[in-house]
Design a protein with these regions (language model features):
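A membrane-topology feature that recognizes alpha-helical transmembrane segments
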Residues: 1-207
Length: 207
């Protein structure tokens, strides 16, 4: 299941240790080159580079610690409006998107804690939630930047990848599945291919 974020798990956390990791550096270089090819050297390039670096950090931290620092989520939300076409649309779509998932989280969490826990006779499920505290701000970011419909594409991709990985984890008897890495992957994929999505589903997206 998707985990709540535990602050105590972040003890000893250091951003520097992640930045010097070779795989992280390679991923950062690849995304930076893509952004440079897309925007050239401009303000948008700089802001998007920062945003994607934050997403990478959040993903790695969540995957390792099952928790994320609040200041990175706050930084993401404060910077992202600068690359949005409209601040008002960013705020509106972000609130609508996040609000919808907060309600969904309530129902799914109720099912996990009150129904599934009794069916499986597993008391540990009574403490689990469908989404962690750190997932909602990232969902708001996705909705604000991509809009409602493209945001749904990103969530669908994230959920599909999470489902596949969750099945693998279940086969290995690993229950904990952090969701932020999948949300980040879904967002980046849609961001990279959004023109293709527009061309394929333009009638639905623009309606």
């Amino acid at each position: 299941m998707i985990l709540p974020k535990g602050r105590e798990d972040l003890e000893g956390f250091s951003i520097k240790s992640f930045l010097i990791d070779k795989k992280v550096l390679i991923l950062q270089i690849v995304l930076t080159l893509f952004l440079y090819n897309k925007f050239g050297f401009c303000v948008n390039f700089i802001i998007w580079t920062i945003l994607l670096y934050i997403l990478i950090l959040l993903s790695i931290i969540d995957y390792k610690f099952k928790a994320v620092p609040d200041y990175l989520l706050l930084l993401l939300l404060l910077i992202s409006p600068f690359v949005s076409d409209s601040l008002i649309d960013f705020i509106k779509n972000g609130f609508i998107f996040a609000g919808g998932f907060v309600i969904l989280n309530f129902f799914v969490t109720f099912y996990i804690q009150n129904i599934k826990s009794k069916i499986l006779k597993d008391d540990t499920l009574k403490e689990q939630t469908a989404l962690g505290e750190g997932d909602i701000p990232l969902i708001a970011f996705i909705g604000g930047i991509l809009g409602i419909k493209l945001g749904l594409f990103a969530i669908m991709i994230a959920s599909l990848i999470a489902l596949i990985h969750g099945i693998y984890n279940a086969s290995k008897k690993i229950q904990d599945t952090p969701f932020i890495p999948y949300l980040s992957i879904g967002f980046i994929i849609v961001f990279l291919i959004q023109e293709t999505i527009y061309n394929t589903f333009s009638n639905w997206i623009l309606s």
